[in-house]
């Protein structure tokens, strides 16, 4: 029975296909359509932006795997599990939008590493309880938010920089929810991200 | 309008004072929050593993798939090159894939101090 539930959960987690763009991804990308076309004719800048987007894609792929590992670990209880699945869905929408934008710019999206590779890199074997999983997710979300903020000055296209800020906002929202779930104090000072 | 002599003396002293020593402990906090989205000390993730990076030639972390630009770079990671990299990676090695920037000099210095410490240098 446990295995059946796990398999169904896996199906749920894997259900949103890579080939079909989610509504959010389409909406995000819609703002990039014109700039993507314009960028394609601006070689050096477009190539650099593709590089940034591919690094972001690798980060999103890692986040998807991390939530997959957390969900399959059996360590998460409701309602935390539902939140983790929702956040994974957000990361899949980010991934889809990034893939579509990279292709629009003429680039080739980087392939995702396997869940096993990510598990090893993140030392998932050390996760023993729900708090451990939440701490890992919290750490990765903060790192992701800061990564998106830190690449903003490097984009050649200001529209893509704005997309990076929107992605950072999603990751910051995830971090805040995870921080509340862990009952950690909120930052005492302003401007706690990107610093 | 003349500035009081005491104020002038204070300003002169401040200008002559050496930069504060880099703080590796603060660098660790910064590293975990700013670099930790993509990097770990001992595992290749989105970016290469960082333990041992200080003093290492760019593009030589074992088993990491680097961009051609970084693989072909002649840069050796030490204070000046790491600082330039964190100011603007693309300016130091055009064609690289990181593009993450750290704006404040004190933040860069502390992160570099931490990487140096973790590299045993």
Predicted features by range, described:
Chain B
Residues 14-17, 22:
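N-terminal signal peptide c-region/cleavage motif recognized by signal peptidases
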Residues 63-83:
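Short Fe-S-cluster ligation motifs
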Residues 22-45, 50:
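Sequence/structural segment immediately N-terminal to covalent heme-attachment motifs in c-type
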């Amino acid at each position: 029975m446990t295995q059946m539930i796990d398999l169904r959960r896996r199906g749920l987690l894997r259900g949103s296909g890579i080939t079909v763009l989610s509504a959010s991804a389409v909406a995000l990308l819609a703002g990039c359509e014109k700039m993507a076309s314009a960028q394609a004719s601006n070689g050096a800048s477009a190539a650099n932006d593709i590089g940034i987007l591919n690094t972001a894609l690798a980060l999103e792929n890692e986040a998807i795997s991390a939530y997959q590992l957390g969900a399959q670990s059996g360590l998460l209880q409701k309602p935390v599990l539902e939140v983790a699945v929702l956040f994974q869905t957000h990361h899949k929408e980010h991934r889809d939008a990034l893939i579509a934008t990279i292709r629009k710019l003429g680039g080739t999206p980087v392939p995702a590493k396997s869940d096993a590779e990510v598990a090893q890199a993140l030392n998932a074997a050390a996760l023993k309880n729900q708090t451990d999983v939440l701490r890992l997710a919290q750490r990765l979300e903060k790192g992701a938010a800061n990564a998106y903020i830190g690449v903003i000055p490097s984009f050649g296209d200001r529209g893509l920089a704005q997309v990076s800020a929107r992605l950072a906002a999603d990751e910051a929202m995830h971090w805040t929810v995870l921080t509340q779930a862990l009952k950690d104090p909120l930052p005492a000072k302003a401007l706690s991200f990107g610093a | 309008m003349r500035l009081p002599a005491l104020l002038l003396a204070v300003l002169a002293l401040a200008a002559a004072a050496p930069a504060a020593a880099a703080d590796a402990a603060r660098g660790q906090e910064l590293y975990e929050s700013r670099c930790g989205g993509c990097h770990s000390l001992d595992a290749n993730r989105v970016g290469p593993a960082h333990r041992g990076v200080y003093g290492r030639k760019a593009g030589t972390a074992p088993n990491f798939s680097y961009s051609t630009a970084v693989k072909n770079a002649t840069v050796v990671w030490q204070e000046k090159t790491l600082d330039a990299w964190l100011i603007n990676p693309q300016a130091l090695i055009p064609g690289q894939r990181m593009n993450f920037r750290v704006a404040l000099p004190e933040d860069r210095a502390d992160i570099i101090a931490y990487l140096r410490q973790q590299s045993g240098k």
